[in-house]
Design a protein with these regions (language model features):
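Hydrophobic/aromatic residues within transmembrane alpha-helices
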Residues: 27, 36, 86, 98, ...
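Helix-coil boundary and interhelical linker segments in multi-pass alpha-helical membrane proteins
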Residues: 1-6, 53-64, 109-122, 169-176, ...
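Hydrophobic transmembrane alpha-helices of multi-pass small-molecule transport proteins
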Residues: 48, 108-111, 121-138, 264-281
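Selected transmembrane alpha-helices and immediately adjacent juxtamembrane segments
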Residues: 3, 147-181, 213
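Residues that define the loop-to-transmembrane-helix transition and helix capping
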Residues: 34-35, 93, 119-121, 177-178, ...
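Hydrophobic/small/kink-forming positions within alpha-helical transmembrane segments
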Residues: 18, 22, 49, 73-78, ...
Length: 281
């Protein structure tokens, strides 16, 4: 039973994140990266608060934990800005698989900070994903600045990987419901103040709001489903299934957005996805 539950929750997370990234592309094309970030994250924030009200879990924080929560929130903000800005200038079918490579960062941090040992398949996964990053960066007649979207995606991958590494510690130090909600409260505050500092106008056409709301619901839905899955089943099982969400995105982008990518970039995407599977085993 736990295995079947893990498969179900892993699939829900995979579908949620895959469709979320697809809709994000359409939202950014219409509302811009910053407004998409604000309204989509605000939606997920509201959903997480409702979830916390239904399943309340409190914890007494220390100064050290508060500092870690603030660092995590800053990294999440950085990750989203880089991710969404990358989508503005590059195909989502290239950006999303790169960002999904964040497990590499988690494992590297685990090695250097927690002194965890690499397995053979993890080393192979590193090589595959680095090769994939090189391949998706290849463009015919590339000009200076042409790879800005790829650089943004790599920045997002590093930020999200570091944030999730810290989040893993915070879950163990508190509990996953409190860590999820409190982290989102801090991130929402940072997003609001950052956009206020940048003097970003938040007004958007009403026709765009359904896209922004759907992104937020799918993103938080995937996060909650993943968290449930790893609590009732094998972490490796849920991680492998959910990590394949770029497959959904790439298929949708190819069918509906008609994104054009080179054969080298296609091979790079496949190599990154293969590395994702290996690194999650």
């Amino acid at each position: 039973m736990p295995l079947s539950q893990g498969i179900i929750f892993g699939l829900i997370a995979m579908l949620s994140w895959g469709f979320s990234d697809f809709i994000v592309k359409m939202a950014i094309d219409r509302a811009g990266a910053y407004r998409t970030l604000f309204y989509s994250y605000l939606t997920g924030f509201i959903v997480s608060i409702i979830f916390f009200i239904i399943f309340p879990q409190f914890f007494r924080l220390t100064a050290f934990l508060v500092i870690l929560f603030l660092i995590e929130a800053f990294l999440v903000l950085l990750g989203y800005i880089a991710f969404y800005r990358g989508i503005e200038v590059e195909n989502i079918s290239i950006v999303s698989p790169i960002v999904a490579g964040y497990p590499v960062v988690i494992i590297l941090l685990s090695y250097f900070i927690l002194r965890e040992v690499f397995t053979l398949h993890q080393i192979i996964a590193f090589i595959l994903m680095i090769l994939g990053l090189v391949l998706v960066s290849i463009k015919k007649k590339a000009k200076i600045g042409d790879n800005k979207g790829v650089y943004m995606a790599i920045t997002a991958m590093l930020a999200f990987g570091s944030a999730i590494f810290i989040f893993g510690y915070l879950i163990k130090a508190t509990n996953w419901i409190f860590a999820l909600v409190f982290g989102r409260i801090l991130t929402m505050l940072l997003i609001f103040n950052y956009l206020k500092f940048r003097k970003i106008q938040l007004k958007v056409p009403k026709s765009i709001l359904p896209f922004l709301i759907m992104v937020g619901i799918l993103e938080i839905g995937g996060a909650i489903s993943y968290s449930f899955g790893v609590n009732v089943s094998l972490v490796s099982l849920v991680s492998v299934i959910s990590s394949l969400y770029p497959l959904i995105l790439v298929m949708l982008a190819g069918i509906f957005l008609k994104e054009r990518i080179s054969n080298a970039q296609k091979l790079g995407i496949f190599t990154i996805l293969l590395g994702l599977v290996l690194i999650s085993l």
